[in-house]
Amino acid sequence: MQIKIGEVESKLNEIIEEEGAAYFVLIDPDEKNYRKIANHVKNYADAIIIGGSIGIINLDEVTKEIKEITGLPTILFPGNVDGVTKEADAVLFMSLMNSKNTYWNMTAPTLGALTIKKYGLETLPMAYLGIEPISKTAVGFVGEVNEIPQKKPEIAGIYSLSASYFGMRWVYLEAGSGAEYPVNNEMIGISKKLSGINIIVGGGIRTPEVAYEKVMSGADVIVTGTLTEKDPKAVEEMKKAIKKAGMDKLKMLSKK
């Protein structure tokens, strides 16, 4: 049986192959200024991911509006089984692999699976890994994460390899929304090298310079959220840095 990859994932893979990296903007549906944020980022992001760690209100309405405003692929990033709507294009179908609670490893995605099928949403199979200092953030608390220490990059690498063996095509290395510092470069590089699948990096990425480093280290996708909420104009410079790094990375790889 041939594995079917949907339209959204195919488009994202195309961007990564041709431009070296993609830029996702995370919009919390509970954010009061989501319309303003959506209007600004529509010319810079490659996709919008929609989700939050704690209770979501009016997800259908917000997702539909964001999709209409941006015209970009809208991908759900569900914090729980209630974080799914038929108004989106796709969903990050994920396992929080290093949670201490099996609910977040397997039960939550299993409970949401039938709804996803009913809505006809495209799924992007993904391992979600909580990296230090995620325990100090909302997702770390809610998800009961046994965070991976930054000084042990090989642990993230092994988890990423395991994810690839499970058939997942994406790994999200997450330091947490508003994290004090981002996932380190060595961890990103090892995770990419061992798994060979798409690596998403988010949390604590506040400057274009840091985003550039992460892409050059092996990240295929950079996610910003809190930064976008505080300074929507920052996304323009962030995109420039990510795309420059992507092309520089492709040139570097072509010489090997």
UniProtKB/Swiss-Prot annotation:
Name the positions where sn-glycerol 1-phosphate binds: 172-178, 203-204, 225-226
Coiled coil feature spans = none
Q: Which GO terms describe its molecular function?
A: imidazoleglycerol-phosphate synthase activity; magnesium ion binding; phosphoglycerol geranylgeranyltransferase activity
Known cofactor(s)? Mg(2+)
Q: Key word Transferase present in the record? A: yes
Q: Where is the signal peptide?
A: none
EC nos: 2.5.1.41
Subcellular location, record wording: Cytoplasm
Q: Can you list the GO cellular component terms from the UniProt entry?
A: cytoplasm
EC class name: transferase
Please provide the Gene Ontology terms (biological process) for this protein.
glycerophospholipid biosynthetic process
The yes or no answer to whether the keyword Cytoplasm is present is: yes
Q: Which SUPFAM superfamilies match?
A: FMN-linked oxidoreductases
- Catalytic activity as recorded in UniProt: sn-glycerol 1-phosphate + (2E,6E,10E)-geranylgeranyl diphosphate = sn-3-O-(geranylgeranyl)glycerol 1-phosphate + diphosphate
* Protein residues bound to Mg(2+): 28, 53
Q: Which domain of life is it from?
A: Archaea
User: What are the record keywords, sorted?
Assistant: Cytoplasm, Lipid biosynthesis, Lipid metabolism, Magnesium, Metal-binding, Phospholipid biosynthesis, Phospholipid metabolism, Transferase
The pathway where this protein functions is: Membrane lipid metabolism; glycerophospholipid metabolism
Q: Which family does it belong to?
A: Belongs to the GGGP/HepGP synthase family. Group II subfamily.
Q: Which NCBIfam families match?
A: GGGP, GGGP-family, PRK04169.1-2, PRK04169.1-5
Q: What does this protein do?
A: Prenyltransferase that catalyzes the transfer of the geranylgeranyl moiety of geranylgeranyl diphosphate (GGPP) to the C3 hydroxyl of sn-glycerol-1-phosphate (G1P). This reaction is the first ether-bond-formation step in the biosynthesis of archaeal membrane lipids.
Q: What is this protein called?
A: Geranylgeranylglyceryl phosphate synthase
Species assigned in the record: Methanococcus maripaludis (strain C6 / ATCC BAA-1332)
